[in-house]
Regions:
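Short glycine/acidic-rich loop motifs that flank beta-strands on beta-rich extracellular proteins
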Residues: 185, 198-200, 219-223, 359-364, ...
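Residue-level signal for WD-repeat beta-propeller blades
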Residues: 182, 189, 202-204, 228, ...
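Extracellular "leader-to-stem" segments immediately downstream of a signal peptide or signal-anchor
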Residues: 83-84, 88-191, 196-361, 365, ...
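Right-handed parallel beta-helix
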Residues: 178-181, 207, 216, 336-394, ...
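Catalytic domains of carbohydrate-active enzymes that cleave complex glycans
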Residues: 479-483, 489-496, 507-614
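Ser/Thr-rich, Pro/Gly/Ala-heavy low-complexity intrinsically disordered linkers and tails
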Residues: 1-103
Length: 614
């Protein structure tokens, strides 16, 4: 079967042992159970997916009575210690074609990113780094807007919102939003105060910005929990409409800015489009996912949200140039096509606000996937200087004291060119299975930038989730700690919850100059979460620090370049996750992140690209 990446099928074959169980559940994190791994870095005993030791179970004996804490079923754990904390083991396992696992000199550069690097550069084995410089608002080419307060829609002075936090301000705030929307946009301003919101807030127009004085001075807390499953308390929601499907005339090549169709006369320069394809049996088989990937099989899925830059109808077929390169091979045999798109919101923002939505403990655990803020079907928008805070409605004793969030934090979904910067979210109540406790979440979105953000005490503090088509996203200088996979309402404790890529082949993304005291994971999750399978390919860890565990077991090639001394790294095959062909992802600069140059790949690529543009 032909590989979809730039690699041989033999190199890219990544299968999961057929003994994995098939689990059903809800969209997003449907059956978010814990996969056992064979890692003994925590001491004697068998270890689980999160590297936690199960007392009384050793790695040289069969442990048929170990209970999976999320599903109350029995799993088998057997094998040998494969901890990557042993430098000799790392060197032995990475010797299969990977670069530089021994001594790295001060001021070193990656072999895949020389001083004369250019997009498309690769080594003699076809290994390469995507150009990640397009992530963020305006494709990273412009600064975030400076919001003027000369003319605002003041929720207190103009609309009578109560700044004491005693009475419901939902109506007043929504009226301010609606007035701004009707005026073609504007700043909905929150002066100093505490605002109680008993309902939901909806923004469905472009050019609307919610702005406070600071996260400490302007605070909103939300009280509703019933009926909030899979919704956000503040929701920016576009109304996308897809146009006529235009089949590609030839395969769209990874790294190319061009696609070809027979008739491009219905397209216009500046138009939003989506490039996608059908999840065919051949596509599934090429990724060794037959019997695992099932949720989207036979459906057309959006992979790349793009903008038309130019159209050449003098050629046959017609050539369409887009603003950001494709990040994966788009095959005609998979019915790859262009679909024009309208209805995305743009130039929307949230900044300088404190947000919380924690409620009574049992109420929080009764609803799944409640976000405090979501941006769905938007482009060129931002979230800046937002922080969670202890909700006045959080429990005052027992579990949940001082909680900030009911379940989940910020969600960016089906969007492009969004920046989430300088924001902190922490202390979720519901960190159980079913998609909860995701603090910074992205789904089926492209070129999203998470910069200088901190996530604490969620389940998965930073996460890509549910569905194909998360590409070109960057996590720059983010920090995660305290991730925990809670078992249930009565026992909200458990194993380490990693930041991770969670579902369906996130492609060509970058984790850059970031710190994980819990961990980050890109692996084959098999049948978990309704067949998550391979969660990533061609993703890069660059200059990664922290005291947690980095797991990279990607389809095709994944890249780990520059790791800190205290960070554990796990690349080799495992019984229940990762590869089964004995290969490992590319590792370079093990325990040498401090001297990696440049320290940020995204910022260097962006400066390089902008310096070359006229």
């Amino acid at each position: 079967v032909d590989a979809y990446s730039s690699l041989d099928a033999e190199q890219s074959g990544r299968a999961l042992d057929a003994s994995l169980r098939n689990l059903d559940g809800e969209e997003g994190d449907v059956s978010d159970v814990i996969t056992p791994l064979l890692d003994t870095s925590a001491g004697d005993g068998a270890a689980t997916e999160d590297g936690q030791v199960l007392d009384g179970v050793t790695n040289d004996t069969e442990a048929s009575d170990v209970t999976d804490p999320d599903e109350d079923v029995l799993v088998d754990v057997e094998g040998e210690d494969i901890s990557a904390t042993d430098a000799s083991l790392v060197e032995e396992d990475i010797s299969q074609g990977e670069e530089d696992t021994t001594v790295v000199e001060e001021g070193w550069r990656s072999a895949l990113y020389p001083t004369d690097w250019f997009p498309g550069f690769s080594d003699n084995e076809g290994r390469f780094l995507h150009d990640f410089s397009y992530a963020g608002y305006g494709n990273g080419e412009v600064s975030l807007p400076t919001v003027s307060l000369d003319e605002v829609f003041d929720v207190v002075a103009d609309f009578g919102a109560d700044p004491s936090g005693e009475t419901d301000a939902t109506g007043a705030i929504q009226n301010a939003i609606d007035e701004a929307s009707g005026a073609g946009g504007g700043v909905v301003f929150f002066p100093e105060g505490l605002f109680r919101v008993d309902g939901k807030l909806l923004i469905s127009a472009s050019n609307v910005v919610l702005k406070g004085v600071s996260p400490e001075a302007s605070r909103l807390y939300f009280s509703q929990s019933n009926g909030m499953a899979y919704l956000g308390h503040i929701r920016f929601l576009g109304s996308p409409a897809m146009g006529t499907d235009l089949p590609l005339s030839q395969d769209g090549e990874s790294g190319s800015f061009e696609v070809f169709v027979e008739d491009a006369s219905s397209l216009e320069v500046g138009q939003d489009i989506v490039i996608g394809w059908v999840i065919t049996e051949a596509f599934v088989a090429a990724h060794d996912m037959t019997g695992t990937w099932e949720a989207f099989n036979g459906t057309w899925q959006p992979f790349f949200q793009r903008e038309v830059v130019s159209i050449d109808m003098e050629t046959t077929p017609h050539r369409v140039e887009v603003d950001v390169p494709l990040r994966y091979l788009s095959r005609v045999s998979d019915s790859a096509s262009i679909r024009p798109q309208n209805g995305l919101l743009s130039e929307c923002g949230v900044e300088d606000l404190g947000l919380s939505n924690a409620v009574a403990w049992s109420a929080a655990w009764a609803q799944n996937q409640v976000h405090v803020l979501s941006m769905e079907n938007v482009k060129d928008s931002w979230i800046r200087n937002v922080a969670s805070f202890p909700s006045p409605l959080a429990p005052t004793s027992g579990n949940g004291v001082g909680a900030h969030l009911q379940s989940s934090g910020i969600l960016v979904k089906l969007s492009k060119r969004v920046s989430v910067v300088e924001s902190t979210l922490s202390d979720a109540e519901n960190i159980g299975s079913g998609g909860n406790g995701y603090l910074f979440e992205v789904r089926q979105s492209d070129e999203v930038l998470f910069r200088d953000c901190v996530g604490k005490n969620g389940r998965h503090n930073f996460i890509q989730n549910w569905g194909f088509g998360t590409t070109g996203c960057v996590w720059l200088r983010v920090e995660s700690e305290g991730g925990t996979s809670g078992l249930n309402e009565s026992f909200p404790f458990g194993l380490t919850g990693y930041s991770e890529f969670h579902h369906s082949l996130a492609t060509g993304n970058l984790i850059d100059s970031s710190t994980f005291h819990d961990g980050f994971s890109i692996i084959n999750r098999g049948s978990y979460s309704s067949g998550a399978g391979h969660t990533g390919t061609e993703n890069v860890f660059w200059n990664t620090g922290g005291t947690g565990l980095l797991r990279s077991k990607q389809f095709g090639w994944g890249y780990v370049i520059g790791t800190a001394l205290q960070l554990e790294v796990e690349l080799e095959s495992g019984l229940f996750s990762g590869t089964t062909d004995g290969s490992s992802d590319y590792l370079e600069g093990y325990e040498a992140a401090a001297d990696l140059s440049p320290s940020s790949l995204y910022e260097d690529q962006l400066a390089r690209r902008l310096s070359l543009e006229p």
